[in-house]
Structures are given as structure tokens and as C-alpha cells.
Amino acid sequence: IIITGKATLAGRPLMWTHRDTGAPYNHIGYFDEGGYRFLGLVNSDDPEGAVWTGSNETGFSIMNTASYNLKDDDIKEMDQEGNLMRKALRVCKTVQDFEHFLDTLPRPMRVEANFGVIDAYGGAAYYETNNERYYKKDANDPNLAPEGYLIYTNFSFEGRTDEGKGYVR
């Protein structure tokens, strides 16, 4: 769930996620590798340190939910969401920065996910993302989120209807 500042007492955006994973051991890592410093959730047995949710020193935060109905190609090498989020935390300060980041990534991106992002300036959006494109869902859009929040699980609204997982949630 991502919540805009208009729906919180403090007037700041908020993100809340849970983690569906088969990795039983996780930890919060501190990253200072050039760019913005950040904290990120990583699988403890992952030597590469893919980040599955995190926040950086500017107030930019990111998470994802897997999508199972948005992929529209036959590319086999996938599951780069954690690497994408690690890079985004290093270089993004705002929701607009994240959009530019996605625009400039080489294709295929090797992802099928809904990335939730918030920033310290009130930005709050989901990006339904596959190998070639993304669809932005802005939680500040009163037509889309009249109460100031969006809830996602393991499917994308722009994806194939009644395919995938997560509809019962």
C-alpha cells in the first residue's frame, strides 16, 4: 500500500509492504556505494545483495509486488527486480527521478512487477512494469485514488484480466 500525505496525520506519504519470499533469512543492509546512501532489505544468503525494499537518505523509498499478468514476451532470464531497486535507491530522489530512471534503462529490463515509490516531496505512485514498458498509477490523482491511497498485490491492472495470481487478495 502507498498512501499520500493527504491521507496521513503527518501530511507525509507512507508505504507499507509485506514480503512473500521463500528466503527464510533476511536482514537490513546499509549501502554507501556512490550516489545516495540507503538501507535495504536483502536475502542474507545473497552475495549480490539484491534489495527487495528500501529507503535512501533523501526520503525516496521503493518496494515491489510481483506481477503475474503483465509479461508479454518469451524472455526467460528475469527476476531482476531486486537489482533494479538497489540501483534506483542509489540514484533517485523523487518519483520523477524514478520515472526517468525507468525511461533510460536498457531493454529488456528483465522484470515483471509493480514498483511502489514515495518521496519526501509528497510523490507516491505505482509503476506496473514489464520488460519493455511501464504504466504509472499516481496515488495523488484524485480520479484514480480519491482517498489518497492505492493497494496492490500480485497482479497489474494493465495486465491480462483473470490471469496470474493475487486476485483473491
What are these regions, as identified by a protein language model?
Residues 4-90, 113, 119-169:
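C-terminal, well-structured catalytic/ligand-binding subdomain of enzymes
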Residues 81-109:
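Intrinsically disordered, low-complexity linker/loop segments enriched in Gly/Pro
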